[in-house]
Amino acid sequence: MDRVAGQVNSRRGELLELAAAMFAERGLRATTVRDIADGAGILSGSLYHHFASKEEMVDELLRGFLDWLFARYRDIVDSTANPLERLQGLFMASFEAIEHHHAQVVIYQDEAQRLASQPRFSYIEDRNKQQRKMWVDVLNQGIEEGYFRPDLDVDLVYRFIRDTTWVSVRWYRPGGPLTAQQVGQQYLAIVLGGITKEGV
């Protein structure tokens, strides 16, 4: 019984991975249940054995990704010694997500705004607010403790970091000439060069 359950869960995971790649490449609207079933070599009806709808697949992909990301973020905020190290950790965790959850990040970037208006996906807006608060708190702490320049517009810095980080998923490809960590370190050096207080 457990072995069968494991096989079902494994197949479900394979189908989710396939769906994520298709959603990221084609977009949610352009990807049908039939497309996913054809890609998996099964009938559409067989896909419904694993998922009630395409929306369930998207929900599971985004929830899983956001749960993972925020667990990483919380761990960094709770375990690092100072705001500078926290900012560095949050920054690099975002690039880790781009490397290891590439399709989910693309889906999130392309579809989150539209999906957030649907009751099933209301958690997306909550997560966006939590993300903003986490980053803004770290930036404010960094200013208060003398790590970052006191004249910074924290909201502007947050938006700059958010947009430059997540938009890189559009051109970055896992397995390319640079790892996400290398890209993240270069981006981080540019950001820190602009916000750190002299002498830090």
UniProtKB/Swiss-Prot annotation:
What UniProt keywords are attached to this protein's entry?
Answer: DNA-binding, Repressor, Transcription, Transcription regulation
What is the species of this protein? Mycobacterium tuberculosis (strain ATCC 25618 / H37Rv)
Q: Name all HTH tetR-type domain ranges.
A: 9-69
Record-given protein name? HTH-type transcriptional repressor KstR2
What are the DNA-binding region positions? Answer: 32-51
The record ties this protein, via Pfam families, to: TetR_C_24, TetR_N
Extract the InterPro entries matched here: Homeodomain-like_sf, HTH-type_TetR-like_transc_reg, HTH_TetR, KstR2_TetR_C, Tet_transcr_reg_TetR-rel_C_sf
Question: So what does this one do?
Answer: Controls the expression of a small regulon that may play a role in the utilization of cholesterol.
Q: What biological-process terms (Gene Ontology) are attached?
A: regulation of DNA-templated transcription
How the protein assembles, per its UniProt entry? Homodimer.
Which GO molecular function annotation, any one, does this entry have?
A: transcription cis-regulatory region binding
